[in-house]
Amino acid sequence: MAKKNEGKRFEEDFRNSVPADVFCYRIKDSSNFYQATKNMCDFILFKSPYLFLLELKSTKANQFSTNEKIIKQHQVDDLYDANMKYTFVKSGFILNYRGRELKTKTVPPETYFIPIEYMREAYYKEKSIHKDLAKKIGIEIPYRKKITRYEYDINLRNFLKK
């Protein structure tokens, strides 16, 4: 059996961390590499009265390129439009900067919810979303490491703070 890529593992850990009283739906990706789907986001969460539209990204680097290959413009724009059009829709990106071992130190993982208003502004102004920028414009999502996987503290009220 093929080893799951780290991004899929992150999505799985995220889904398993969503509280039981929150509706959670993962939008399926296309398995056809020739015709990529144009999904607005990866996850739809509902906790009355809010609907959350979330796109998840994971990297081992210190930044996410705003290159179309990494962060899709249609996702940024569609999430922004939904967020602005509907009062009880909250959209954003969840950026996971995976931990890694360097020669001199261990860099712990960091995960942030970036509200779409801030993400859109950064997407059009910056060449990348560096971890320091995510820390400044986002809301940190606490985690704890189990043996090999992660559990995230998904408190949706925190997503409404910025």
Predicted regions and their residues:
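Conserved catalytic cores of phosphodiester-cleaving nucleases, focusing on short active-site segments
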Residues: F43-L45, Y50-A61
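Acidic-basic catalytic patches of nuclease active cores, encompassing PD-(D/E)XK
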Residues: M1-T37
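Nucleic-acid nuclease catalytic cores
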Residues: A82-E126
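Short connector loops at helix/strand junctions that flank enzyme active sites
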Residues: K38-M40, P49-L53, H74, F88
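Charged phosphate-binding loop/patch that engages nucleotide di/tri-phosphates or the phosphate backbone
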Residues: K136-K162
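N-terminal prepro-regions of secreted/extracellular proteins
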Residues: E121, E126-I139
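Histidine- and/or cysteine-centered catalytic micro-motif in compact active-site loops
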Residues: D29-S30, L56-T59, N96
